[in-house]
Protein backbone atom coordinates (compact mmCIF):
# COMPACT_ATOMS: atom_id res chain seq x y z
CA UNK A 1 0.00 0.00 0.00
CA UNK A 2 1.26 3.45 -0.91
CA UNK A 3 0.52 6.28 1.45
CA UNK A 4 -0.65 9.55 -0.02
CA UNK A 5 1.03 12.15 2.13
CA UNK A 6 -0.62 15.24 3.52
CA UNK A 7 -0.99 17.94 0.86
CA UNK A 8 1.47 20.78 1.01
CA UNK A 9 -0.01 23.93 2.50
CA UNK A 10 0.32 26.94 0.18
CA UNK A 11 3.15 29.24 1.12
CA UNK A 12 2.42 32.81 2.22
CA UNK A 13 3.06 35.48 -0.35
CA UNK A 14 5.96 36.70 1.74
CA UNK A 15 7.74 33.44 0.96
CA UNK A 16 10.87 33.53 -1.16
CA UNK A 17 9.15 31.19 -3.61
CA UNK A 18 6.67 33.94 -4.38
CA UNK A 19 8.87 37.00 -4.29
CA UNK A 20 12.00 35.52 -5.84
CA UNK A 21 10.62 33.17 -8.48
CA UNK A 22 13.32 34.26 -10.89
CA UNK A 23 15.90 32.73 -8.57
CA UNK A 24 14.46 29.29 -9.35
CA UNK A 25 16.19 29.35 -12.72
CA UNK A 26 19.59 29.62 -11.04
CA UNK A 27 19.16 26.06 -9.73
CA UNK A 28 18.62 24.67 -13.22
CA UNK A 29 21.63 23.50 -15.17
CA UNK A 30 21.77 24.59 -18.80
CA UNK A 31 23.94 22.56 -21.17
CA UNK A 32 24.69 23.78 -24.70
CA UNK A 33 26.42 20.63 -25.94
CA UNK A 34 24.67 17.31 -26.55
CA UNK A 35 26.63 14.10 -26.92
CA UNK A 36 24.82 10.96 -27.98
CA UNK A 37 26.36 7.53 -27.43
CA UNK A 38 25.31 3.93 -28.00
CA UNK A 39 26.11 0.96 -25.79
CA UNK A 40 26.24 -2.16 -28.03
CA UNK A 41 26.19 -4.49 -25.01
CA UNK A 42 23.03 -3.17 -23.35
CA UNK A 43 21.63 -1.81 -26.64
CA UNK A 44 20.88 1.47 -24.91
CA UNK A 45 21.56 5.03 -25.86
CA UNK A 46 23.29 7.52 -23.59
CA UNK A 47 22.49 11.20 -23.74
CA UNK A 48 25.35 13.11 -22.16
CA UNK A 49 25.41 11.53 -18.68
CA UNK A 50 21.96 9.91 -18.85
CA UNK A 51 21.37 6.29 -19.87
CA UNK A 52 18.03 5.92 -21.65
CA UNK A 53 16.08 3.04 -20.09
CA UNK A 54 12.50 3.07 -21.38
CA UNK A 55 9.68 5.11 -22.84
CA UNK A 56 7.32 6.70 -20.33
CA UNK A 57 4.98 8.37 -22.78
CA UNK A 58 4.41 9.73 -26.26
CA UNK A 59 2.35 12.90 -26.19
CA UNK A 60 1.22 15.47 -28.69
CA UNK A 61 3.99 17.84 -27.70
CA UNK A 62 6.92 15.52 -27.05
CA UNK A 63 8.17 12.11 -26.00
CA UNK A 64 9.21 11.29 -22.45
CA UNK A 65 11.96 8.79 -21.66
CA UNK A 66 12.99 7.21 -18.39
CA UNK A 67 16.72 7.62 -17.83
CA UNK A 68 19.37 6.98 -15.20
CA UNK A 69 21.99 9.54 -14.20
CA UNK A 70 25.25 7.62 -14.62
CA UNK A 71 26.92 9.86 -12.06
CA UNK A 72 24.46 9.50 -9.19
CA UNK A 73 22.33 6.51 -10.22
CA UNK A 74 19.17 8.60 -9.78
CA UNK A 75 16.22 8.08 -12.12
CA UNK A 76 14.96 11.06 -14.12
CA UNK A 77 12.44 11.71 -16.86
CA UNK A 78 13.70 13.28 -20.09
CA UNK A 79 11.20 15.10 -22.26
CA UNK A 80 12.23 15.33 -25.92
CA UNK A 81 10.95 18.38 -27.78
CA UNK A 82 11.21 19.17 -31.48
CA UNK A 83 13.13 22.40 -31.97
CA UNK A 84 11.39 23.03 -35.29
CA UNK A 85 7.73 22.96 -36.20
CA UNK A 86 6.50 20.34 -38.64
CA UNK A 87 4.56 22.14 -41.33
CA UNK A 88 3.10 20.41 -44.36
CA UNK A 89 3.89 21.94 -47.70
CA UNK A 90 7.23 23.35 -46.64
CA UNK A 91 10.60 22.22 -47.86
CA UNK A 92 12.60 20.12 -45.44
CA UNK A 93 15.34 22.72 -45.68
CA UNK A 94 13.04 25.47 -44.36
CA UNK A 95 13.13 25.17 -40.59
CA UNK A 96 10.68 27.14 -38.49
CA UNK A 97 11.47 27.48 -34.80
CA UNK A 98 8.83 26.01 -32.50
CA UNK A 99 7.84 28.87 -30.17
CA UNK A 100 6.28 26.51 -27.63
CA UNK A 101 9.69 25.04 -26.78
CA UNK A 102 11.09 28.28 -25.38
CA UNK A 103 7.75 29.06 -23.79
CA UNK A 104 7.69 25.74 -21.92
CA UNK A 105 11.29 26.19 -20.79
CA UNK A 106 10.69 29.71 -19.51
CA UNK A 107 7.59 28.60 -17.62
CA UNK A 108 9.33 25.66 -15.96
CA UNK A 109 12.38 27.73 -15.04
CA UNK A 110 10.09 29.91 -12.94
CA UNK A 111 8.57 26.97 -11.04
CA UNK A 112 9.79 25.56 -7.76
CA UNK A 113 7.08 23.94 -5.66
CA UNK A 114 6.45 20.54 -4.11
CA UNK A 115 3.30 20.03 -6.16
CA UNK A 116 4.92 20.92 -9.50
CA UNK A 117 7.30 18.60 -11.37
CA UNK A 118 10.85 19.92 -11.03
CA UNK A 119 13.09 20.85 -13.96
CA UNK A 120 16.71 19.82 -13.31
CA UNK A 121 18.58 20.46 -16.55
CA UNK A 122 18.09 21.79 -20.07
CA UNK A 123 20.07 20.17 -22.89
CA UNK A 124 19.87 22.73 -25.67
CA UNK A 125 22.47 22.18 -28.38
CA UNK A 126 22.07 24.56 -31.35
CA UNK A 127 23.30 21.78 -33.65
CA UNK A 128 20.55 19.39 -32.53
CA UNK A 129 16.99 19.27 -33.86
CA UNK A 130 15.86 18.28 -30.37
CA UNK A 131 15.72 20.03 -27.02
CA UNK A 132 15.87 17.81 -23.93
CA UNK A 133 14.35 18.67 -20.55
CA UNK A 134 15.65 16.61 -17.63
CA UNK A 135 12.76 16.41 -15.19
CA UNK A 136 11.87 14.95 -11.83
CA UNK A 137 10.74 11.32 -12.19
CA UNK A 138 7.44 10.46 -10.52
CA UNK A 139 7.65 6.70 -10.20
CA UNK A 140 3.94 5.99 -9.66
CA UNK A 141 2.92 7.61 -12.91
CA UNK A 142 -0.26 9.55 -13.68
CA UNK A 143 -3.46 9.49 -11.65
CA UNK A 144 -5.72 6.66 -12.83
CA UNK A 145 -9.49 6.94 -12.50
CA UNK A 146 -10.81 4.22 -14.82
CA UNK A 147 -9.81 0.57 -15.29
CA UNK A 148 -6.69 -0.11 -17.37
CA UNK A 149 -8.71 -1.96 -20.02
CA UNK A 150 -11.02 1.01 -20.58
CA UNK A 151 -10.39 3.97 -22.84
CA UNK A 152 -10.87 7.17 -20.85
CA UNK A 153 -12.90 8.77 -23.62
CA UNK A 154 -15.34 5.82 -23.44
CA UNK A 155 -15.39 5.38 -19.66
CA UNK A 156 -18.90 5.19 -18.15
CA UNK A 157 -18.03 4.85 -14.46
CA UNK A 158 -17.83 4.15 -11.65
CA UNK A 159 -14.41 5.50 -10.66
CA UNK A 160 -11.74 3.19 -9.28
CA UNK A 161 -10.92 5.84 -6.63
CA UNK A 162 -12.74 6.54 -3.40
CA UNK A 163 -13.95 10.03 -2.56
CA UNK A 164 -11.25 10.25 0.11
CA UNK A 165 -8.49 9.36 -2.35
CA UNK A 166 -9.85 11.90 -4.81
CA UNK A 167 -9.83 14.60 -2.13
CA UNK A 168 -6.17 13.97 -1.40
CA UNK A 169 -5.33 14.33 -5.11
CA UNK A 170 -7.38 17.51 -5.44
CA UNK A 171 -5.82 19.20 -2.41
CA UNK A 172 -2.32 18.69 -3.82
CA UNK A 173 -3.40 19.96 -7.25
CA UNK A 174 -5.06 23.05 -5.75
CA UNK A 175 -1.84 23.77 -3.85
CA UNK A 176 0.17 23.52 -7.08
CA UNK A 177 -2.29 25.66 -9.05
CA UNK A 178 -2.24 28.36 -6.36
CA UNK A 179 1.51 28.58 -6.78
CA UNK A 180 1.36 28.65 -10.59
CA UNK A 181 -1.30 31.35 -10.67
CA UNK A 182 0.68 33.43 -8.19
CA UNK A 183 3.54 33.33 -10.71
CA UNK A 184 1.29 34.43 -13.57
CA UNK A 185 1.24 30.94 -15.11
CA UNK A 186 -1.89 29.39 -16.59
CA UNK A 187 -1.37 25.67 -17.18
CA UNK A 188 -4.16 25.27 -19.74
CA UNK A 189 -4.09 21.45 -19.72
CA UNK A 190 -5.02 20.23 -16.24
CA UNK A 191 -6.24 16.63 -16.51
CA UNK A 192 -5.58 13.34 -14.68
CA UNK A 193 -2.86 12.19 -17.07
CA UNK A 194 -0.89 15.38 -16.34
CA UNK A 195 -1.04 14.78 -12.59
CA UNK A 196 1.87 12.56 -11.60
CA UNK A 197 2.38 10.73 -8.31
CA UNK A 198 5.84 10.57 -6.77
CA UNK A 199 7.17 7.59 -4.84
CA UNK A 200 6.05 9.16 -1.53
CA UNK A 201 2.51 9.82 -2.75
CA UNK A 202 2.73 13.53 -3.55
CA UNK A 203 0.69 14.61 -6.57
CA UNK A 204 2.57 16.93 -8.93
CA UNK A 205 1.40 18.98 -11.91
CA UNK A 206 3.35 18.19 -15.09
CA UNK A 207 3.48 18.97 -18.83
CA UNK A 208 3.68 22.70 -19.47
CA UNK A 209 3.65 22.33 -23.25
CA UNK A 210 0.67 24.67 -23.72
CA UNK A 211 1.08 26.79 -20.58
CA UNK A 212 1.01 30.57 -20.86
CA UNK A 213 2.69 33.10 -18.61
CA UNK A 214 3.54 36.76 -18.16
CA UNK A 215 6.66 38.28 -16.70
CA UNK A 216 4.60 40.57 -14.49
CA UNK A 217 2.87 37.74 -12.64
CA UNK A 218 -0.65 38.74 -13.68
CA UNK A 219 -3.16 35.90 -13.69
CA UNK A 220 -5.01 37.41 -16.66
CA UNK A 221 -3.08 36.87 -19.87
CA UNK A 222 -4.37 38.65 -22.93
CA UNK A 223 -3.55 36.78 -26.13
CA UNK A 224 -2.74 38.23 -29.48
CA UNK A 225 -4.83 37.08 -32.44
CA UNK A 226 -2.19 34.52 -33.43
CA UNK A 227 -1.88 33.21 -29.86
CA UNK A 228 -5.65 33.02 -29.68
CA UNK A 229 -5.86 30.77 -32.73
CA UNK A 230 -3.08 28.54 -31.41
CA UNK A 231 -4.53 28.31 -27.90
CA UNK A 232 -7.83 27.05 -29.26
CA UNK A 233 -6.02 24.34 -31.23
CA UNK A 234 -3.85 23.12 -28.35
CA UNK A 235 -4.74 21.18 -25.25
CA UNK A 236 -7.30 18.45 -24.59
CA UNK A 237 -10.79 19.30 -25.99
CA UNK A 238 -12.73 17.27 -23.40
CA UNK A 239 -11.20 19.51 -20.72
CA UNK A 240 -11.72 22.80 -22.59
CA UNK A 241 -13.59 25.57 -20.79
CA UNK A 242 -16.66 27.00 -22.61
CA UNK A 243 -14.80 30.23 -23.40
CA UNK A 244 -12.25 28.17 -25.35
CA UNK A 245 -15.00 26.48 -27.37
CA UNK A 246 -16.84 29.64 -28.41
CA UNK A 247 -15.89 32.12 -31.13
CA UNK A 248 -18.68 34.59 -30.39
CA UNK A 249 -16.99 36.51 -27.58
CA UNK A 250 -13.60 38.12 -27.12
CA UNK A 251 -11.28 35.58 -25.58
CA UNK A 252 -8.85 36.12 -22.74
CA UNK A 253 -6.72 33.29 -21.40
CA UNK A 254 -7.14 33.55 -17.64
CA UNK A 255 -6.65 31.30 -14.65
CA UNK A 256 -10.40 30.56 -14.78
CA UNK A 257 -9.80 27.99 -17.52
CA UNK A 258 -7.63 26.00 -15.09
CA UNK A 259 -10.52 26.06 -12.61
CA UNK A 260 -12.81 24.57 -15.25
CA UNK A 261 -10.38 21.81 -16.25
CA UNK A 262 -9.84 21.09 -12.55
CA UNK A 263 -13.61 20.63 -12.28
CA UNK A 264 -13.61 18.18 -15.20
CA UNK A 265 -10.73 16.34 -13.54
CA UNK A 266 -12.56 16.09 -10.20
CA UNK A 267 -15.69 14.86 -11.99
CA UNK A 268 -13.61 12.06 -13.57
CA UNK A 269 -12.02 11.13 -10.24
CA UNK A 270 -15.36 10.98 -8.42
CA UNK A 271 -17.67 9.50 -11.04
CA UNK A 272 -15.35 7.64 -13.43
CA UNK A 273 -16.44 9.37 -16.63
CA UNK A 274 -16.25 12.70 -18.45
CA UNK A 275 -18.96 15.28 -17.68
CA UNK A 276 -19.26 16.25 -21.36
CA UNK A 277 -18.65 13.84 -24.21
CA UNK A 278 -19.56 13.49 -27.88
CA UNK A 279 -18.64 11.70 -31.08
CA UNK A 280 -17.13 14.74 -32.82
CA UNK A 281 -15.32 17.92 -31.91
CA UNK A 282 -18.17 20.23 -32.90
CA UNK A 283 -20.68 18.19 -30.90
CA UNK A 284 -18.32 18.18 -27.93
CA UNK A 285 -17.90 21.95 -28.01
CA UNK A 286 -21.65 22.45 -28.30
CA UNK A 287 -22.16 20.16 -25.31
CA UNK A 288 -19.60 22.04 -23.22
CA UNK A 289 -21.18 25.41 -24.06
CA UNK A 290 -24.88 24.54 -23.83
CA UNK A 291 -25.50 21.23 -22.09
CA UNK A 292 -26.40 21.40 -18.37
CA UNK A 293 -24.22 19.49 -15.93
CA UNK A 294 -25.60 16.07 -14.98
CA UNK A 295 -24.59 13.60 -12.27
CA UNK A 296 -24.98 9.87 -11.64
CA UNK A 297 -27.69 9.10 -9.10
CA UNK A 298 -26.82 8.37 -5.48
CA UNK A 299 -27.94 4.77 -6.00
CA UNK A 300 -25.43 4.37 -8.84
CA UNK A 301 -22.70 5.76 -6.60
CA UNK A 302 -23.22 3.02 -4.03
CA UNK A 303 -21.42 0.58 -6.34
CA UNK A 304 -17.69 0.19 -6.72
CA UNK A 305 -15.03 2.21 -4.85
CA UNK A 306 -17.55 4.90 -3.79
CA UNK A 307 -19.91 2.53 -1.99
CA UNK A 308 -19.16 4.03 1.43
CA UNK A 309 -20.21 7.62 0.74
CA UNK A 310 -23.10 9.28 2.54
CA UNK A 311 -25.87 11.30 0.94
CA UNK A 312 -24.47 14.45 2.54
CA UNK A 313 -21.01 13.84 1.05
CA UNK A 314 -22.56 13.11 -2.34
CA UNK A 315 -24.58 16.35 -2.18
CA UNK A 316 -21.51 18.40 -1.22
CA UNK A 317 -19.55 16.87 -4.11
CA UNK A 318 -22.23 17.94 -6.58
CA UNK A 319 -22.30 21.44 -5.11
CA UNK A 320 -18.53 21.85 -5.53
CA UNK A 321 -18.64 20.60 -9.12
CA UNK A 322 -21.46 22.98 -10.02
CA UNK A 323 -19.30 25.87 -8.84
CA UNK A 324 -16.21 24.56 -10.65
CA UNK A 325 -18.05 23.86 -13.91
CA UNK A 326 -19.78 27.23 -14.03
CA UNK A 327 -20.02 28.20 -17.69
CA UNK A 328 -19.52 31.90 -16.91
CA UNK A 329 -15.80 32.25 -16.04
CA UNK A 330 -16.47 35.30 -13.85
CA UNK A 331 -18.77 33.25 -11.60
CA UNK A 332 -16.43 30.27 -11.27
CA UNK A 333 -15.24 29.36 -7.78
CA UNK A 334 -11.75 30.51 -6.73
CA UNK A 335 -8.96 28.21 -5.57
CA UNK A 336 -9.01 29.62 -2.04
CA UNK A 337 -12.72 28.81 -1.78
CA UNK A 338 -12.19 25.25 -3.00
CA UNK A 339 -10.00 24.45 0.00
CA UNK A 340 -12.67 25.53 2.50
CA UNK A 341 -15.61 23.98 0.68
CA UNK A 342 -17.49 21.44 2.86
CA UNK A 343 -16.66 18.59 0.50
CA UNK A 344 -12.93 19.24 0.92
CA UNK A 345 -12.73 19.80 4.68
CA UNK A 346 -15.68 18.09 6.42
CA UNK A 347 -14.90 14.44 5.62
CA UNK A 348 -12.13 12.06 6.60
CA UNK A 349 -10.09 14.72 8.34
CA UNK A 350 -9.19 12.56 11.34
CA UNK A 351 -7.68 9.69 9.34
CA UNK A 352 -6.30 11.70 6.43
CA UNK A 353 -2.77 10.42 6.98
CA UNK A 354 -3.90 6.80 6.59
CA UNK A 355 -5.40 7.20 3.15
CA UNK A 356 -3.77 4.73 0.78
CA UNK A 357 -4.17 3.41 -2.71
CA UNK A 358 -3.91 -0.04 -4.17
CA UNK A 359 -0.73 -0.82 -6.04
CA UNK A 360 -2.93 -1.70 -9.00
CA UNK A 361 -4.18 1.88 -9.02
CA UNK A 362 -0.85 3.68 -8.69
CA UNK A 363 1.77 1.18 -9.76
CA UNK A 364 5.48 1.87 -9.66
CA UNK A 365 7.60 1.04 -12.69
CA UNK A 366 10.27 -1.48 -11.78
CA UNK A 367 13.71 -0.60 -13.09
CA UNK A 368 16.60 -3.02 -13.21
CA UNK A 369 19.80 -1.95 -11.42
CA UNK A 370 22.75 -0.60 -13.41
CA UNK A 371 24.65 -3.15 -15.47
CA UNK A 372 27.39 -4.99 -13.63
CA UNK A 373 29.64 -4.95 -16.71
CA UNK A 374 33.03 -3.62 -15.72
CA UNK A 375 33.91 -2.43 -19.20
CA UNK A 376 31.55 -0.94 -21.73
CA UNK A 377 32.65 0.52 -25.05
CA UNK A 378 30.38 3.33 -26.23
CA UNK A 379 29.94 4.32 -29.85
CA UNK A 380 29.51 7.99 -30.69
CA UNK A 381 26.36 8.74 -32.67
CA UNK A 382 25.26 11.72 -34.75
CA UNK A 383 23.71 14.40 -32.58
CA UNK A 384 20.38 14.07 -34.40
CA UNK A 385 19.94 10.33 -33.98
CA UNK A 386 16.50 9.31 -32.82
CA UNK A 387 15.25 7.57 -29.68
CA UNK A 388 12.44 5.98 -31.69
CA UNK A 389 14.02 2.54 -31.22
CA UNK A 390 16.42 1.82 -28.40
CA UNK A 391 18.24 -0.88 -30.37
CA UNK A 392 18.73 1.05 -33.57
CA UNK A 393 20.29 4.22 -34.84
CA UNK A 394 19.04 6.46 -37.60
CA UNK A 395 19.62 10.04 -38.61
CA UNK A 396 16.84 12.58 -39.06
CA UNK A 397 16.73 15.56 -41.43
CA UNK A 398 19.80 14.36 -43.28
CA UNK A 399 20.33 16.14 -46.59
CA UNK A 400 21.30 13.64 -49.28
CA UNK A 401 23.14 16.39 -51.14
CA UNK A 402 25.51 16.75 -48.20
CA UNK A 403 26.78 13.16 -48.36
CA UNK A 404 30.54 13.11 -48.45
CA UNK A 405 32.78 10.75 -50.37
CA UNK A 406 35.03 8.31 -48.61
CA UNK A 407 38.03 10.57 -49.21
CA UNK A 408 36.32 13.40 -47.34
CA UNK A 409 35.76 11.39 -44.21
CA UNK A 410 37.99 11.54 -41.19
CA UNK A 411 39.87 8.25 -41.19
CA UNK A 412 40.29 8.17 -37.44
CA UNK A 413 37.46 7.30 -35.12
CA UNK A 414 37.65 6.95 -31.37
CA UNK A 415 34.56 5.82 -29.49
CA UNK A 416 34.09 6.98 -25.93
CA UNK A 417 34.89 4.54 -23.18
CA UNK A 418 32.79 4.24 -20.05
CA UNK A 419 34.91 2.29 -17.61
CA UNK A 420 33.50 1.75 -14.13
CA UNK A 421 36.76 0.33 -12.78
CA UNK A 422 39.31 2.41 -14.74
CA UNK A 423 40.44 -0.52 -16.86
CA UNK A 424 42.79 0.08 -19.75
CA UNK A 425 40.85 1.27 -22.80
CA UNK A 426 40.52 -1.14 -25.67
CA UNK A 427 42.42 -0.67 -28.90
CA UNK A 428 40.08 0.44 -31.64
CA UNK A 429 40.86 0.62 -35.34
CA UNK A 430 38.73 2.00 -38.11
CA UNK A 431 39.22 -0.54 -40.88
CA UNK A 432 37.05 1.07 -43.50
CA UNK A 433 33.80 2.81 -44.14
CA UNK A 434 31.31 3.63 -46.83
CA UNK A 435 28.34 5.99 -46.84
CA UNK A 436 24.95 5.12 -48.23
CA UNK A 437 21.41 4.54 -47.02
CA UNK A 438 21.01 1.42 -44.93
CA UNK A 439 18.09 -0.35 -43.39
CA UNK A 440 18.21 -3.32 -41.02
CA UNK A 441 15.84 -6.27 -41.34
CA UNK A 442 14.85 -5.78 -37.71
CA UNK A 443 14.45 -2.10 -36.96
CA UNK A 444 16.00 0.24 -39.51
CA UNK A 445 13.04 1.67 -41.39
CA UNK A 446 14.08 5.25 -42.05
CA UNK A 447 14.46 6.31 -45.67
CA UNK A 448 17.06 8.92 -44.79
CA UNK A 449 20.79 8.52 -45.14
CA UNK A 450 23.01 6.35 -42.98
CA UNK A 451 26.71 5.73 -42.70
CA UNK A 452 27.78 2.12 -42.31
CA UNK A 453 31.07 1.44 -40.64
CA UNK A 454 32.71 -1.97 -40.50
CA UNK A 455 35.37 -2.13 -37.82
CA UNK A 456 37.65 -4.63 -36.18
CA UNK A 457 37.84 -4.15 -32.44
CA UNK A 458 40.59 -5.83 -30.47
CA UNK A 459 40.48 -6.87 -26.83
CA UNK A 460 42.52 -4.83 -24.30
CA UNK A 461 46.27 -5.05 -24.70
CA UNK A 462 48.36 -6.31 -21.79
CA UNK A 463 51.08 -4.03 -20.52
CA UNK A 464 52.71 -1.98 -23.25
CA UNK A 465 51.73 -4.37 -26.03
CA UNK A 466 50.21 -2.52 -28.97
CA UNK A 467 48.05 -3.54 -31.90
CA UNK A 468 49.74 -2.84 -35.21
CA UNK A 469 48.04 -2.01 -38.48
CA UNK A 470 49.61 -2.63 -41.84
CA UNK A 471 48.22 -1.72 -45.25
CA UNK A 472 48.74 -3.71 -48.41
CA UNK A 473 47.03 -2.58 -51.60
CA UNK A 474 43.30 -2.35 -51.05
CA UNK A 475 43.41 -4.54 -47.95
CA UNK A 476 44.20 -3.64 -44.38
CA UNK A 477 46.12 -6.03 -42.15
CA UNK A 478 45.67 -5.98 -38.38
CA UNK A 479 47.89 -7.74 -35.89
CA UNK A 480 45.69 -8.94 -33.06
CA UNK A 481 46.10 -8.41 -29.32
CA UNK A 482 45.09 -10.62 -26.42
CA UNK A 483 41.98 -12.41 -25.07
CA UNK A 484 40.99 -15.39 -27.26
CA UNK A 485 37.48 -15.26 -28.68
CA UNK A 486 35.86 -15.18 -32.08
CA UNK A 487 32.82 -12.96 -31.87
CA UNK A 488 31.18 -10.47 -34.12
CA UNK A 489 28.97 -7.95 -32.38
CA UNK A 490 26.54 -5.45 -33.82
CA UNK A 491 23.43 -3.58 -32.69
CA UNK A 492 21.36 -6.41 -34.16
CA UNK A 493 23.11 -9.33 -32.50
CA UNK A 494 26.26 -11.37 -31.90
CA UNK A 495 27.73 -13.90 -34.31
CA UNK A 496 30.26 -16.44 -32.96
CA UNK A 497 32.65 -17.89 -35.53
CA UNK A 498 32.78 -21.60 -34.80
CA UNK A 499 33.24 -22.90 -38.35
CA UNK A 500 35.44 -21.88 -41.25
CA UNK A 501 32.79 -19.57 -42.66
CA UNK A 502 30.02 -17.58 -41.03
CA UNK A 503 27.59 -15.55 -43.07
CA UNK A 504 26.92 -11.95 -42.10
CA UNK A 505 24.64 -11.21 -45.04
CA UNK A 506 21.62 -10.70 -42.79
CA UNK A 507 23.30 -7.93 -40.83
CA UNK A 508 22.92 -5.10 -43.33
CA UNK A 509 20.68 -4.43 -46.28
CA UNK A 510 21.54 -1.43 -48.48
CA UNK A 511 19.03 1.05 -49.83
CA UNK A 512 20.25 3.46 -52.47
CA UNK A 513 23.12 3.59 -54.95
CA UNK A 514 24.86 0.45 -53.72
CA UNK A 515 24.44 -3.25 -54.55
CA UNK A 516 21.10 -4.62 -53.45
CA UNK A 517 22.68 -6.93 -50.88
CA UNK A 518 25.77 -6.91 -48.75
CA UNK A 519 27.45 -10.26 -48.46
CA UNK A 520 29.91 -10.40 -45.61
CA UNK A 521 31.57 -13.47 -44.21
CA UNK A 522 34.64 -14.58 -42.33
CA UNK A 523 36.98 -17.16 -43.79
CA UNK A 524 39.54 -18.88 -41.59
CA UNK A 525 42.61 -20.45 -43.13
CA UNK A 526 46.23 -21.23 -42.38
CA UNK A 527 49.35 -19.75 -43.88
CA UNK A 528 52.63 -21.03 -42.48
CA UNK A 529 52.46 -20.53 -38.70
CA UNK A 530 49.71 -17.94 -38.56
CA UNK A 531 45.95 -17.78 -39.00
CA UNK A 532 44.50 -15.43 -41.59
CA UNK A 533 41.09 -14.00 -40.95
CA UNK A 534 39.35 -12.64 -44.01
CA UNK A 535 36.25 -10.44 -43.88
CA UNK A 536 34.40 -9.76 -47.13
CA UNK A 537 31.56 -7.36 -47.83
CA UNK A 538 29.66 -7.33 -51.18
CA UNK A 539 32.78 -8.59 -53.01
CA UNK A 540 34.18 -5.07 -53.29
CA UNK A 541 35.19 -4.28 -49.74
CA UNK A 542 37.76 -6.80 -48.51
CA UNK A 543 39.61 -6.73 -45.20
CA UNK A 544 42.33 -9.15 -44.18
CA UNK A 545 43.34 -9.50 -40.56
CA UNK A 546 46.47 -11.45 -39.73
CA UNK A 547 46.83 -13.11 -36.36
CA UNK A 548 50.47 -14.09 -35.92
CA UNK A 549 50.16 -15.24 -32.30
CA UNK A 550 47.20 -17.55 -32.93
CA UNK A 551 45.11 -15.47 -30.52
CA UNK A 552 41.50 -14.60 -31.11
CA UNK A 553 39.67 -11.38 -31.59
CA UNK A 554 36.13 -10.00 -31.89
CA UNK A 555 34.79 -8.00 -34.79
CA UNK A 556 32.02 -5.43 -34.47
CA UNK A 557 29.65 -4.07 -37.11
CA UNK A 558 28.36 -0.64 -36.21
CA UNK A 559 25.69 1.23 -38.14
CA UNK A 560 26.06 4.99 -37.69
Swiss-Prot record:
Recorded catalytic activity of this chain's protein: L-seryl-[protein] + ATP = O-phospho-L-seryl-[protein] + ADP + H(+); L-threonyl-[protein] + ATP = O-phospho-L-threonyl-[protein] + ADP + H(+)
Pfam family, one: Pkinase
Amino-acid positions noted as binding ATP in the UniProt annotation, renumbered to this chain: 56-64, 79
Enzyme Commission numbers on file: 2.7.11.1
Superkingdom per UniProt: Eukaryota
Post-translational modification: Autophosphorylated.
Claim: Coiled coil is one of the keywords in the record: no
Keyword Nucleotide-binding assigned: yes
EC supergroup of this enzyme: transferase
SMART domains: S_TKc (SM00220)
Domain Protein kinase: 50-344
Any one GO molecular-function label of the UniProt entry: protein serine kinase activity
Active-site feature positions: 189
InterPro entries listed in its UniProt record: Aur-like (IPR030616), Kinase-like_dom_sf (IPR011009), Prot_kinase_dom (IPR000719), Protein_kinase_ATP_BS (IPR017441), Ser/Thr_kinase_AS (IPR008271)
Record keywords, A-Z: ATP-binding, Kinase, Nucleotide-binding, Phosphoprotein, Serine/threonine-protein kinase, Stress response, Transferase
Family to which this protein belongs: Belongs to the protein kinase superfamily. Ser/Thr protein kinase family.
Role of this protein: One of the three SNF1 protein kinases (with SAK1 and ELM1) which are required for growth on nonfermentable carbon sources and nonpreferred sugars and for response to environmental stress. Activates SNF1 by phosphorylation of its activation-loop 'Thr-210'. Required for the regulation by SNF1 of the transcription of a large set of genes, the modification the activity of metabolic enzymes, and the control of various nutrient-responsive cellular developmental processes. Also phosphorylates GAL83, MIG1 and SIP2.
Domain remark text: The C-terminus (residues 351 to 560) is required for efficient SNF1 pathway signaling.
Protein name (Swiss-Prot/TrEMBL): Serine/threonine-protein kinase TOS3
Originating species: Saccharomyces cerevisiae (strain YJM789) (Baker's yeast)
Amino acid sequence: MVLLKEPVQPLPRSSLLYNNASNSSSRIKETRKVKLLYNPLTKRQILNNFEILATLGNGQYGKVKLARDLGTGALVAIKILNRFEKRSGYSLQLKVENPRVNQEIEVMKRCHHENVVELYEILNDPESTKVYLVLEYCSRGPVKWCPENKMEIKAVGPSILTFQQSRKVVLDVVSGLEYLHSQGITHRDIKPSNLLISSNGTVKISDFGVAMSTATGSTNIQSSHEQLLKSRALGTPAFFAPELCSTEKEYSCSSAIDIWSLGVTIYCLLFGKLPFNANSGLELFDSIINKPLEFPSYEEMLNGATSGITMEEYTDAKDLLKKLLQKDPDKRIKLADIKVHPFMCHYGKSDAASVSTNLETFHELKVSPPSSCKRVELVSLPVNSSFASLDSVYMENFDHNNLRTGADRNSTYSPSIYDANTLSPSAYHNIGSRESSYSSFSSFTSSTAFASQISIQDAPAIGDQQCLIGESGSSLRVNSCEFPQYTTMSPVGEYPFESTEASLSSTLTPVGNVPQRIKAHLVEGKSNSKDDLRIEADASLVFEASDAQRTRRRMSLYKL
